[in-house]
Amino acid sequence: MISLKIWIDISNAPHVRFFKDVIKYLESEGEDLIITARDFGDIHKLMNMYDIDFISVGKHGVSLYDKLKESTSRVYELVDVINNEKVDVALSKHSIELPRIAFGLGIPSLYVLDNEHALAANKLTLPLCNRIITPNKIDIWKLMQFGADPNSIIPYNGTSELMHFKSFEYNDNIFDDLDLKLKYPKTILMRPEPSLASYLDADCHKSVLSPIVDVLKEYANILILPRFKAQAEIFEGIDNVTILEPPVDTSSLMKKADLVIGAGGTMNREAAILQTPVISCYPGKTLAVDQYYIDQGLMFRSNDIDEIIQKALAFIVNPHEKIDF
C-alpha cells in the first residue's frame, strides 16, 4: 500500500484536541504525517501532553502590524519546510498560512471552518481551499461572500467540538488531582474571551468576566482558565478564585463543574456537549455553531452582566432546575 504524505498545520490550542484523534487514526493507517504548529498560547504544551511530534514554526502577533508581519514570516518559513516534502494533501482548521502555501505549491488542501465571522481569515483562505468542511448550520452564502467555491463546501450535522471527545475518559477525581481548595459546594468554571484573536476587538488586559467574578465568588468556587499570562493577571489575588495553569484536563473539569461561564466559544460548546449547564457571554456576534446549541436548549447566551449573574445565582440555589433559556 502506498502511503500519503499529509501536512497538518495547527495554529490554535483547541485545534490540538480536534486533530489529536485524526492524527492517531492516520498514523494507524500508515500515512506519513508532517505536523507544524505555531508558538501561541498552550499549543506546544498540549502537543506534548498528547505526545504529538511537531515542528514549531512561527508565532502569534498582537497588533494588526504584528499579525501581518508574523503571518508573512511564518509563510516564508513554512515554504522552506514543506517545499521538499512532496506533500499529497494539506489539512488545517482556520490556519491562515496553510491554504496560501498549499495553493502556491499546488498541494490540494482540506480546510475545517466553524467561524463565519472571521472576516480577515476567511477572505485570505477560503478562495484558495479545494475542500471546506463546515457545520450545516453555517450559511453557505456567507462563505461564498468570502470567495468560497460552493462546490467545494462539505456540510455536516454538528460542530467540530464533537471530535474532542472521541477518546475522552472522564476523570471524576480531577478536582483532587489538581489539589483544589474549594470553599463552597458549587464550582463555576470560567474561560475569558479570545482577546488576541483577529476577529474580536478586545483589550487583552481586561475581561468581560471581571464583574461576574466579583459577585459570584461570594457564592461559589471560581476556576479561571486563562488563555495567556496577561489574562491570568487580571484575576490574580482575588479571594476564592483559582487560576488554572494549562495544560489541564479541561474536559473532565467541565464535566465536574456545576456551571460553565465562557466568554469564548470552544469551551462553551464542549460544555454543551457534556450537558454541563453553560452561559455564553462571548462579546462578539453569535456564531451559527453557538446558535446550534442555544436552539437545543443546551446553552444560554447573554451580554447583560446583571442577567448572567441572576441566571448563575438562580442555578446555584436551584441546581436541579434547568437554566431558563
Predicted regions located by residue number:
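Catalytic binding pocket for nucleotide-activated donors in carbohydrate/polymer assembly enzymes
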Residues: 273-320
